[in-house]
Design a protein with these regions (language model features):
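Alpha-helical DNA-contacting segments of helix-turn-helix folds
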Residues: 57-66
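Basic, helix-initiating cap at the start of DNA-binding domains
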Residues: 1-27, 31-40, 46, 57
């Protein structure tokens, strides 16, 4: 009996994710309700609440499912090269229509504590942890110095992308990414020791 219930549950789960993304992309986070997501998915509101505690978490999970591994750190010859490639992937994502969805969610999160928490927990913190691990690997490889604050370095690298995404202050193009990466290296790359 449990085996027949599981596929139905998975189908409902997937339908809810698709409905949430479709509605939010079309109308914006604030304009969509849990009831509308459930109705669009063809499920009851309680079915939605069995999977997620609130609208913010279902919307974030729908976004994450859409993205998949699109902005994950790629395999490369070194941690630094993986970091450089991932910056380019993140920039391409922000330039896409999905970047507009991130911009909208960050904007809405300023006045919605549940969305702000879901955005941090499901989007921002896992990505920061991936960058942190990558930078630590580059330090272990001897490519980067180990005497800097990694969280500040993450903000320097990725904060500029979010700044341009949110404020439209400039293009998030390949040249901008290379400049950002090179400036990061200029301040953090390991140097040969100098004789005294």
């Amino acid at each position: 009996m449990g085996a027949t219930g599981r596929p139905r549950s998975q189908a409902a789960h997937d339908a809810i994710l698709k409905a949430a993304l479709r509605l939010v992309a079309k109308r914006g986070f604030r304009a969509v309700s849990v009831n509308e997501i459930a109705a669009e998915a063809g499920v009851g509101k309680m079915t939605l609440y069995r999977h997620w505690p609130n609208k913010a978490t279902v919307v974030m999970d729908s976004l994450l499912k859409l993205i998949g591994n699109e902005t994950a750190f790629p395999e490369a010859d070194s941690a630094l090269e993986s970091l450089r490639l991932q910056l380019h992937l993140q920039a391409a994502f922000f330039r896409s229509s999905r970047g507009n969805l991130i911009r909208s969610l960050v904007s809405e999160a300023q006045s919605d504590p549940e969305l702000a928490a879901a955005f941090r927990d499901r989007w921002l913190n896992p990505r920061r942890e991936g960058v942190r691990q990558n930078i630590q690997a580059a330090i272990s490889e001897g490519s980067l110095r180990g005497d800097f604050n990694i969280d500040t370095a993450i903000d320097q690298l990725y904060g500029s992308l979010y700044y341009r995404l949110l404020l439209g202050s400039g293009a998030i193009n390949e040249q901008f990414i290379e400049d950002t990466y090179q400036q990061f290296l200029a301040g953090h790359k390991a140097r040969l020791s100098v004789r005294r």
